[in-house]
């Protein structure tokens, strides 16, 4: 395949979305199920790996080996209280690998474990494939979005996931900023406007305030919670119904992973219903120990269950206003992004906070982030379209960055909401004469000291002994991805010294990433083999059943000899019986069986075509009439199942009689490329 354009990927906690900017506009790309968002789920079975819709659709049957919420694990330590809390809600197993969390699953009869970066890379690979299928070209470059409040470790881990999936990550950008691009381009904002992006998704929450003017998007402040979203609202409802089930039936389902998963899926559906109705029903047959669980929940009860979480969404709004030094009256537009902003109570709380100001719902909350990422991808890959050529994005770092030096003193070098990329230099010194080295600890500074996040330590060694304290110039450089790099120069020698960073967050090493890239390619190759096998099996099954039903159709009575009919039926039954006994055969075996079946069927079908319409070269072949219903029957027998519909749509009433010329020109010609009829030499398009 030729090289395709760069894409924008919204890698979400629960759903992901991919878009591309081409021909002067953004196109959000639908997956093979026709959905414009794809579940961020990966499932492992005895025979294959499933990603996206296929994975989510089987989760109730295979809860312990279906992984989701990788975004809530990525860039975190195993002992992080957030990870420990989430583990109570996850049906899959999370293990401790030298302070780094890994998910453990059974795959093809073996126990396998994966880092969150690997799971996320599988979802990214799926999004890459969705784009490639649509574009017909190889996709190598992408912009990937992250919550604005993601820290350095989470950003780096997301970038690593992109690398493992085979993508060159052009940029990591903040989700609300990407949504603002979508809004700004959609509204064609000219004069200066202050826009507040309220982004509440499946697992994360961000608030950003931007000033948009003539294509310049300047982020003024950002705030949020990397662990708040629709899944937390689902959890409250699940716990409510577990308690109700226990109260009604004196049975505790909380330890039954399959039952809890079925309940969770029902709660997610109910939550969506409550955005447009005041009541939703839950109906689950044989939920636990044969008990059918039929109940309902009102919107008021749902709001009461989540009252503290809903109210808590206003805290980051207030914080971002303070940081931007703005009054709520100075905000021109409040833009809703993320599926959870459809919840009426959240909309009401936000509207009341802004004194009844109308909320802007003009952009698709599920697609806006991918839309903005696609625009940024186009800009970074040199697109010169009029719509985007003058667009400038000025983003900020969400957290202050500081160093803890001798005596536990915290020195902030880069303040939060500083425009990135940025570089700050500070001169440090040793605290005693003849000190051979300096150890400094680098922190992301939270609101409270206890929230300070240790990014790592750097040690400057090899300082020549001196009676006067040498001057060490340390430079902190935050790039456009929001990822930090550190360098240092010993001013006494004028020479740059190498800094060794030991990262307590346990980032992947270069060797780890290279190994994971190779493993990802191996898993993809296995997936391709499995896909080919399933395709060959389905093709054989479809062919055998279609052929069988065709010759048994009463419309063929008198047109096919009993001997020929029996030949086809016997061979079809033989193949169907073989299929029943060989569900896990290899692709070549299915292909061989199909060839054997075609050897029996094709000559008989050829004979039927000849008797129905005459072969080319026969007298007055252009004028011979042929029964359309017979041609449809025969065509269907020779085609894959999905093409049945295509023929039915392209044909008119079966009772009509067409000349062969009309039939083939008007109908067969239009679908020839799809049906590949030229593989059957007895069908000629005149």
UniProtKB/Swiss-Prot annotation:
Its domain description in UniProt is: The N-terminal nucleotide binding domain (NBD) (also known as the ATPase domain) is responsible for binding and hydrolyzing ATP. The C-terminal substrate-binding domain (SBD) (also known as peptide-binding domain) binds to the client/substrate proteins. The two domains are allosterically coupled so that, when ATP is bound to the NBD, the SBD binds relatively weakly to clients. When ADP is bound in the NBD, a conformational change enhances the affinity of the SBD for client proteins.
Pfam families tied to this protein: HSP70
Q: Record's PROSITE patterns?
A: HSP70_1 (PS00297), HSP70_2 (PS00329), HSP70_3 (PS01036)
Residue numbers spanned by region Substrate-binding domain (SBD)? 394-507
Q: Does the keyword Nucleotide-binding apply?
A: yes
Q: Does the keyword Nucleotide-binding apply?
A: yes
**Record-level GO BP terms:** chaperone cofactor-dependent protein refolding; protein refolding
**What name appears for this protein in its UniProt entry?**
Heat shock cognate 71 kDa protein
Tell me what organism the protein belongs to. Answer: Oryzias latipes
Keyword list, A-Z:
ATP-binding, Nucleotide-binding, Stress response
**Similarity section:** Belongs to the heat shock protein 70 family.
GO CC annotation terms, alphabetical: cytoplasm; cytosol; nucleus; plasma membrane
